Amino acid sequence: MRKNLHYLFPVLAVLLFVGCNTGDKSQQAMDNNENVSQQMSPVTIDDSTVNGLVVYYPEFSCIDLVCEKMPSQEDTNIVFCAEAAFTHELLDEFAHSNIDGDHVSGGKRYTGAKCKDNSGAFAWFSDSTWEFVNGEYSELLDSVAAAGGMGFGQAIIIHDGESIQPLWREGVNQYRALCEKDGRLCIVDSRDEVSYEQFVEMLEAFGPRHALYMDMGAGWNHSWWRDSDGKVHEIHPIAEKSRYCTNWITFYK
Protein backbone atom coordinates (compact mmCIF):
# COMPACT_ATOMS: atom_id res chain seq x y z
CA MET A 1 0.00 0.00 0.00
CA ARG A 2 1.39 3.38 -0.95
CA LYS A 3 1.41 6.13 1.60
CA ASN A 4 1.39 9.89 1.04
CA LEU A 5 4.10 11.78 2.85
CA HIS A 6 2.45 14.53 4.87
CA TYR A 7 4.89 14.68 7.73
CA LEU A 8 7.28 17.37 8.86
CA PHE A 9 10.02 15.85 11.00
CA PRO A 10 13.50 16.97 12.02
CA VAL A 11 16.06 16.49 9.26
CA LEU A 12 16.74 13.16 10.92
CA ALA A 13 15.07 12.09 14.15
CA VAL A 14 16.69 9.11 15.81
CA LEU A 15 15.04 6.86 18.37
CA LEU A 16 17.66 5.26 20.62
CA PHE A 17 16.81 2.33 22.86
CA VAL A 18 19.32 0.78 25.27
CA GLY A 19 19.83 -2.94 24.75
CA CYS A 20 21.96 -5.67 26.37
CA ASN A 21 25.72 -5.34 26.50
CA THR A 22 27.10 -8.23 24.45
CA GLY A 23 30.75 -7.25 24.53
CA ASP A 24 33.28 -4.47 24.06
CA LYS A 25 32.37 -3.96 20.39
CA SER A 26 28.68 -3.57 21.19
CA GLN A 27 29.43 -1.30 24.15
CA GLN A 28 31.51 0.93 21.90
CA ALA A 29 28.68 1.11 19.36
CA MET A 30 26.27 1.96 22.18
CA ASP A 31 28.55 4.73 23.47
CA ASN A 32 28.91 6.16 19.97
CA ASN A 33 25.13 6.22 19.49
CA GLU A 34 24.63 7.92 22.85
CA ASN A 35 27.21 10.57 21.93
CA VAL A 36 25.38 11.17 18.65
CA SER A 37 22.06 11.53 20.46
CA GLN A 38 23.55 14.24 22.67
CA GLN A 39 24.74 16.16 19.61
CA MET A 40 21.39 16.02 17.85
CA SER A 41 18.73 18.63 18.33
CA PRO A 42 16.05 17.60 18.77
CA VAL A 43 16.16 13.91 19.74
CA THR A 44 12.97 11.86 19.92
CA ILE A 45 12.96 9.00 22.46
CA ASP A 46 10.05 6.56 22.62
CA ASP A 47 10.26 4.68 25.91
CA SER A 48 7.28 2.52 24.98
CA THR A 49 9.14 0.89 22.09
CA VAL A 50 11.26 -2.24 22.32
CA ASN A 51 14.75 -1.98 23.77
CA GLY A 52 17.67 -2.88 21.54
CA LEU A 53 16.65 -0.98 18.38
CA VAL A 54 17.89 2.25 16.82
CA VAL A 55 15.27 3.80 14.54
CA TYR A 56 16.14 6.51 12.02
CA TYR A 57 13.33 8.69 10.62
CA PRO A 58 14.65 10.81 7.72
CA GLU A 59 12.75 13.87 6.56
CA PHE A 60 12.89 13.71 2.78
CA SER A 61 11.31 14.86 -0.44
CA CYS A 62 12.86 12.24 -2.71
CA ILE A 63 14.38 8.74 -2.56
CA ASP A 64 16.61 7.06 -5.12
CA LEU A 65 18.64 3.88 -5.43
CA VAL A 66 22.12 5.17 -6.15
CA CYS A 67 24.31 2.57 -7.86
CA GLU A 68 28.02 2.00 -8.46
CA LYS A 69 29.45 4.72 -6.19
CA MET A 70 28.34 5.59 -2.67
CA PRO A 71 26.79 9.07 -2.47
CA SER A 72 29.25 11.75 -1.40
CA GLN A 73 29.01 13.16 2.09
CA GLU A 74 29.70 16.53 0.44
CA ASP A 75 26.24 16.43 -1.15
CA THR A 76 24.30 18.42 1.43
CA ASN A 77 20.98 17.46 -0.17
CA ILE A 78 21.39 13.92 1.19
CA VAL A 79 20.14 13.16 4.69
CA PHE A 80 20.61 9.36 4.82
CA CYS A 81 22.08 6.56 2.73
CA ALA A 82 22.70 2.85 3.31
CA GLU A 83 23.33 -0.34 1.32
CA ALA A 84 19.98 -1.73 0.15
CA ALA A 85 19.95 -4.83 -2.08
CA PHE A 86 22.46 -7.65 -1.80
CA THR A 87 25.59 -7.56 -3.94
CA HIS A 88 25.93 -10.86 -5.79
CA GLU A 89 29.71 -11.28 -6.08
CA LEU A 90 32.87 -9.49 -4.92
CA LEU A 91 33.82 -7.82 -8.19
CA ASP A 92 36.34 -5.04 -8.76
CA GLU A 93 34.21 -3.50 -11.51
CA PHE A 94 30.60 -2.41 -11.18
CA ALA A 95 27.77 -3.98 -13.15
CA HIS A 96 24.03 -3.70 -12.56
CA SER A 97 23.89 -7.44 -13.15
CA ASN A 98 25.90 -7.87 -9.93
CA ILE A 99 23.07 -6.42 -7.82
CA ASP A 100 20.77 -9.17 -6.56
CA GLY A 101 17.40 -8.79 -8.24
CA ASP A 102 16.08 -6.42 -10.88
CA HIS A 103 16.01 -2.85 -9.64
CA VAL A 104 15.09 0.71 -10.63
CA SER A 105 17.56 3.56 -10.27
CA GLY A 106 16.90 7.09 -11.46
CA GLY A 107 13.67 5.96 -13.09
CA LYS A 108 15.36 3.26 -15.18
CA ARG A 109 14.92 -0.48 -14.74
CA TYR A 110 18.00 -2.72 -14.71
CA THR A 111 18.38 -6.49 -14.80
CA GLY A 112 20.09 -7.88 -11.72
CA ALA A 113 21.31 -11.30 -10.65
CA LYS A 114 18.80 -13.95 -9.65
CA CYS A 115 18.38 -14.21 -5.89
CA LYS A 116 16.14 -16.78 -4.22
CA ASP A 117 16.11 -14.76 -0.98
CA ASN A 118 14.41 -11.78 -2.65
CA SER A 119 10.89 -12.49 -1.46
CA GLY A 120 9.63 -8.92 -1.76
CA ALA A 121 10.49 -5.37 -2.73
CA PHE A 122 10.20 -1.67 -1.95
CA ALA A 123 9.44 1.07 -4.46
CA TRP A 124 9.19 4.84 -4.16
CA PHE A 125 7.25 6.79 -6.77
CA SER A 126 7.97 10.34 -7.91
CA ASP A 127 4.57 11.45 -6.62
CA SER A 128 5.89 10.82 -3.08
CA THR A 129 4.09 7.53 -2.54
CA TRP A 130 5.67 4.17 -1.83
CA GLU A 131 4.84 0.49 -1.81
CA PHE A 132 6.10 -2.66 -0.10
CA VAL A 133 5.38 -5.92 -1.95
CA ASN A 134 5.38 -9.49 -0.69
CA GLY A 135 6.10 -11.90 -3.55
CA GLU A 136 6.57 -11.22 -7.26
CA TYR A 137 7.57 -7.61 -7.90
CA SER A 138 8.42 -7.35 -11.61
CA GLU A 139 5.19 -5.48 -12.37
CA LEU A 140 5.91 -3.08 -9.52
CA LEU A 141 9.33 -2.28 -10.97
CA ASP A 142 7.81 -1.60 -14.39
CA SER A 143 5.33 0.79 -12.81
CA VAL A 144 7.87 2.65 -10.71
CA ALA A 145 10.29 2.95 -13.64
CA ALA A 146 7.54 4.45 -15.78
CA ALA A 147 6.83 6.90 -12.96
CA GLY A 148 10.47 7.95 -12.63
CA GLY A 149 10.99 6.42 -9.20
CA MET A 150 13.19 3.76 -7.62
CA GLY A 151 12.86 0.21 -6.35
CA PHE A 152 14.78 -2.87 -5.28
CA GLY A 153 14.18 -6.44 -4.16
CA GLN A 154 15.08 -7.92 -0.80
CA ALA A 155 13.82 -10.38 1.79
CA ILE A 156 10.46 -9.32 3.21
CA ILE A 157 10.34 -9.73 6.98
CA ILE A 158 6.93 -8.28 7.86
CA HIS A 159 4.10 -7.45 5.45
CA ASP A 160 0.75 -5.91 6.42
CA GLY A 161 1.65 -6.55 10.04
CA GLU A 162 2.26 -10.27 9.59
CA SER A 163 5.69 -11.88 9.96
CA ILE A 164 6.95 -13.55 6.80
CA GLN A 165 10.49 -14.39 7.99
CA PRO A 166 11.83 -15.86 4.75
CA LEU A 167 15.49 -15.42 5.49
CA TRP A 168 17.03 -17.02 8.56
CA ARG A 169 20.60 -15.85 8.79
CA GLU A 170 23.14 -17.86 10.77
CA GLY A 171 25.19 -16.45 13.63
CA VAL A 172 24.87 -13.04 15.24
CA ASN A 173 25.06 -9.66 13.55
CA GLN A 174 23.78 -6.11 13.76
CA TYR A 175 20.76 -6.31 11.47
CA ARG A 176 18.85 -3.61 9.59
CA ALA A 177 15.44 -3.25 7.96
CA LEU A 178 13.57 -0.62 5.98
CA CYS A 179 10.20 -0.23 7.68
CA GLU A 180 6.90 1.56 7.53
CA LYS A 181 5.70 2.45 11.01
CA ASP A 182 2.53 4.47 11.60
CA GLY A 183 2.61 5.74 8.02
CA ARG A 184 6.25 6.82 8.21
CA LEU A 185 9.33 5.34 6.58
CA CYS A 186 12.21 4.48 8.88
CA ILE A 187 15.43 2.50 8.98
CA VAL A 188 15.64 0.15 11.95
CA ASP A 189 18.95 -1.23 13.25
CA SER A 190 19.66 -3.65 16.06
CA ARG A 191 21.78 -1.77 18.57
CA ASP A 192 23.83 -4.87 19.43
CA GLU A 193 24.84 -8.06 17.68
CA VAL A 194 21.90 -10.46 17.92
CA SER A 195 20.65 -13.56 16.15
CA TYR A 196 18.38 -12.99 13.18
CA GLU A 197 15.53 -14.60 15.10
CA GLN A 198 16.02 -12.12 17.94
CA PHE A 199 16.00 -9.24 15.47
CA VAL A 200 12.72 -10.43 13.98
CA GLU A 201 11.23 -10.69 17.47
CA MET A 202 12.33 -7.13 18.24
CA LEU A 203 10.82 -5.92 14.98
CA GLU A 204 7.56 -7.66 15.82
CA ALA A 205 7.51 -5.88 19.17
CA PHE A 206 8.29 -2.57 17.43
CA GLY A 207 5.19 -3.15 15.32
CA PRO A 208 5.86 -1.88 11.79
CA ARG A 209 3.28 -2.48 9.08
CA HIS A 210 6.05 -3.52 6.71
CA ALA A 211 9.72 -4.48 7.14
CA LEU A 212 12.19 -5.29 4.37
CA TYR A 213 15.68 -6.63 5.01
CA MET A 214 18.68 -4.43 4.17
CA ASP A 215 22.21 -5.64 3.48
CA MET A 216 24.48 -5.62 6.53
CA GLY A 217 27.71 -7.18 7.78
CA ALA A 218 31.19 -5.65 8.10
CA GLY A 219 31.75 -3.28 5.18
CA TRP A 220 28.24 -3.66 3.81
CA ASN A 221 26.86 -1.81 6.84
CA HIS A 222 28.85 1.39 6.21
CA SER A 223 26.20 4.12 6.11
CA TRP A 224 25.69 7.69 7.21
CA TRP A 225 23.16 10.38 7.97
CA ARG A 226 23.19 14.16 8.31
CA ASP A 227 21.92 16.05 11.35
CA SER A 228 20.05 19.36 11.43
CA ASP A 229 23.35 21.26 11.64
CA GLY A 230 24.61 19.60 8.46
CA LYS A 231 27.11 17.37 10.27
CA VAL A 232 27.58 13.85 8.87
CA HIS A 233 27.49 10.87 11.25
CA GLU A 234 28.75 7.48 10.10
CA ILE A 235 26.79 4.56 11.56
CA HIS A 236 29.45 1.95 10.79
CA PRO A 237 33.02 2.52 9.55
CA ILE A 238 34.41 1.67 6.14
CA ALA A 239 35.79 -1.88 6.09
CA GLU A 240 37.45 -4.22 3.59
CA LYS A 241 34.23 -5.23 1.83
CA SER A 242 32.91 -1.67 1.58
CA ARG A 243 34.65 -1.34 -1.78
CA TYR A 244 32.42 -4.08 -3.18
CA CYS A 245 29.15 -2.35 -2.29
CA THR A 246 26.99 -1.64 -5.32
CA ASN A 247 23.79 0.17 -4.33
CA TRP A 248 22.45 2.53 -1.68
CA ILE A 249 18.96 3.68 -0.78
CA THR A 250 19.41 7.43 -0.57
CA PHE A 251 17.08 9.97 1.02
CA TYR A 252 17.19 13.58 -0.19
CA LYS A 253 15.81 16.59 1.67
Where are the model-predicted features located?
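Short glycine-rich loop/turn motifs
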Residues: 118-120, 172-177, 245-246
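Conserved, well-ordered active-site substructure
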Residues: 94-113, 169, 180, 184-193, ...
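Flexible, glycine-rich surface segments
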Residues: 148-188
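Zymogen propeptides
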Residues: 21-114, 188-189
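Active-site-adjacent helix-turn-beta-strand microarchitecture at beta-sheet edges
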Residues: 91-162
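C-terminal motif of bacterial Sec signal peptides marking the signal peptidase cleavage site
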Residues: 16-19
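Bacterial N-terminal signal peptides that target proteins for export
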Residues: 1-9
